[in-house]
Amino acid sequence: MYTQDRFMSPQYKARFKGYVQVTKPGIIFGNLISVAGGFLLAAKGDVNLALMLASLVGLSLVVASGCAVNNCIDRDIDAKMQRTCKRVTVTGEIAVGNVLAFGLALGVLGFSILALFTNALALLFAVIGYIVYVGVYSLYMKRNSVYGTLVGSFSGAVPPVVGYCSVTGQMDMGAAILLLMFSLWQMPHSYAIAIFRFNDYAAANIPVLPVAEGMTKAKLHIVLYIAVFALVSALLPLAGYTGIAFMAVTCATSLWWLAMALKGYRHGVDIQRWARQVFGFSIITIMALSITMALDSQVIKEQVIGQTNLFTLVK
């Protein structure tokens, strides 16, 4: 009874909630969708459920680890930002050492699952993405360079590639397109956040593009990155990895997103509201494309099988 009462106590619940929060569940969920999208794109309907589960769980734990360690690294700048000043690593509700140990334990478990159940290439991408996010981005680039977002975009693009390579075991054109596509998506998504959270980033002296070089340049970069993202996304169907459904969805979402970005140049536009709209639609775009590429790749496989069967009959 004592043990049960202890686990049900408000203090225990608050501590448990704190440990969950440092892993950033929203980010984990978004990465789960992209991992599944990359995996199913490569599988083309021939899904190994055990392998898929291992990829999803392993990568989720790696992402959770990176987020927890990032909370420890960023606690000084988090204290200066309204959005993050209540994090447990800032308030001291949970000791930083405990959060760090928790994060590293999650990483060991996640990498172990990927090592045991996927393949060397998937594991390698996960390791590189982790090192870039924790070691390069969080420890140095985020604080010291306007190019921090660009570096961070690589680690954000790794999850779908891990999912894809878990199936194929090789770095082919499909994996390269995914890596480039998701890296490009990260840029306008992140710049939009930096605009509507401008005061926070300025208070913490983080040199994101809007703070370091102004809103005009940030708006231009958002438009340019969305335009290039649209072109790169179209490479998946053009290269035969997906079909017409993906092409239709990528054209519709990318053009709508681009049109939304161009509204930032309207006279008298509410820049904060505009940035939130660009950010919100960036999530809709990447979710729609992740789901569509997973489903549309199955159609491609069925078409290939049908053509093969027809060829066999004619022969």
UniProtKB/Swiss-Prot annotation:
Topology of the protein relative to the lipid bilayer: Multi-pass membrane protein
Asked if Glycoprotein is a keyword of the record, the answer is no
GO biological process terms held by the UniProt record: heme O biosynthetic process
Quick one: where is this thing mainly located? membrane
Compartment list: Cell inner membrane
Any GO MF annotation of the entry? protoheme IX farnesyltransferase activity
Segments crossing the lipid bilayer: 25-45, 49-69, 87-107, 120-139, 145-165, 176-196, 220-240, 242-262, 280-300
Q: Which Pfam families match?
A: UbiA
Pathway membership of this protein?
A: Porphyrin-containing compound metabolism; heme O biosynthesis; heme O from protoheme: step 1/1
The UniProt entry's GO CC annotations, sorted and at most eight, read: plasma membrane
Report whether Cell inner membrane shows up as a keyword of the record.
yes
**Reaction(s) this enzyme catalyzes, per UniProt:** heme b + (2E,6E)-farnesyl diphosphate + H2O = Fe(II)-heme o + diphosphate
Enzyme Commission number: 2.5.1.141
Q: Which UniProt keywords apply?
A: Cell inner membrane, Cell membrane, Heme biosynthesis, Membrane, Transferase, Transmembrane, Transmembrane helix
Q: What the protein does?
A: Converts heme B (protoheme IX) to heme O by substitution of the vinyl group on carbon 2 of heme B porphyrin ring with a hydroxyethyl farnesyl side group.
What does the sequence similarity comment in the record state about its family?
Belongs to the UbiA prenyltransferase family. Protoheme IX farnesyltransferase subfamily.
Q: What else is known?
A: Carbon 2 of the heme B porphyrin ring is defined according to the Fischer nomenclature.
* Matches recorded under NCBIfam families: cyoE_ctaB, PRK04375.1-1
Q: What is this protein called?
A: Protoheme IX farnesyltransferase 1
What are the top taxonomic ranks of the organism?
Bacteria, Pseudomonadati, Pseudomonadota, Gammaproteobacteria, Alteromonadales
Q: State which gene encodes it.
A: cyoE1
